[in-house]
């Protein structure tokens, strides 16, 4: 399962993952995340695609790599 926090896309940009939601028509699980650069756009991506491995110069690499957990209010 996906935990909220900071993730790095294989192309180098960081994103804040907010959690997993469900598509209203298909009930497919999607990851809800926000870019931590530019206009900080809000995005969704199918969970399976978010978790998949891509080939970069012939080497397997996670599409998104977990970088850091965000502290809960109790941990602050």
Predicted regions: what they are:
Residues 1-76:
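Mixed-charge, low-complexity intrinsically disordered regions
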């Amino acid at each position: 399962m996906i935990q909220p926090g900071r993730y790095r896309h294989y192309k180098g940009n960081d994103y804040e993952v907010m959690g997993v939601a469900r598509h209203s028509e298909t009930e497919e699980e999607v990851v809800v995340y926000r870019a931590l650069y530019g206009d900080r756009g809000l995005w969704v991506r199918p969970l399976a695609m978010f978790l998949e491995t891509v080939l970069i110069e012939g080497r397997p690499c996670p599409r998104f790599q977990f970088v850091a957990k965000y502290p809960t209010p109790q941990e602050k």
